[in-house]
Amino acid sequence: MERALLIIDGTVLVLRPWFAKVSAPWAVARNQLRKEAAKYTHVAVVIDRTMDTFRRKLDPRYKAHRPPASAELIAHFNRFEEEVTKMGIALFGSLEVEADDLAATLTRHAVAAGLPVLIQAPDKDLFQLIRDAAPSVRVIAPKKGWDINEAGVMERLGVTPSQVTDFQALVGDATDGVIGVAGVGAKTAAALLTARGTLDAIYADLDGLVTLPIRGAKTLPRKLLAGKDDAMLARRLVTLRADVDMGADPLAKCEMP
């Protein structure tokens, strides 16, 4: 077994076979979990229990376009949770935060304990947690062929992990209903952050942006000023919480038998 903490997004694990119209999504998810869990000394499953988290309170538009889960799907989630518990694998869920926040908090505990982390979830929001320095943190998604380190973040987004939240604040995230700055796309956002480093530094000198070798640079001060409130709110929405109360020594709960 590899000495590392594997964090699996259980919600995604159930949803994938559900959307594939498999007859028993919970069973497919359980079997996949069993296979992956056998490889690591520490394993945790994190799940979303509600969409009405603190982010929805910050912005009612957050994930507002997503329909509520059907009774049948909820039954599959419940059965999967029962199976996880039977397997003796740590399961974490919350009515206040999302699975990604639980993953971020577990990652903080693991890094502090010198334990490498692998987060299995096809979610760019998690890129902000990635680090190459020991103990490393990587985001993996076998179905997508992901095994992403710092270079992988740069390759995909054009920024470093520490810049991911500022990048998302600029471009937004239609998947989650996060509104960024209108007229600022991924390439422009990456170029701005490469030149200025942070979102705050960009806004500290809007007039100076016109001299940057970026296509449409002369229009950037106007666009960024108009979208400032959206960008600042977006940054709050996409920043993962790593301070969730998960009880005493949550890492100990993740130790595999």
Functional labels for PLM-detected ranges:
Residues 2-116, 120, 126-145, 231-233, ...:
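Noncatalytic, basic helical substrate-engagement surface that gates or grips nucleic-acid strands
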Residues 99, 125-126, 188, 198:
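Short phosphate-engaging motifs
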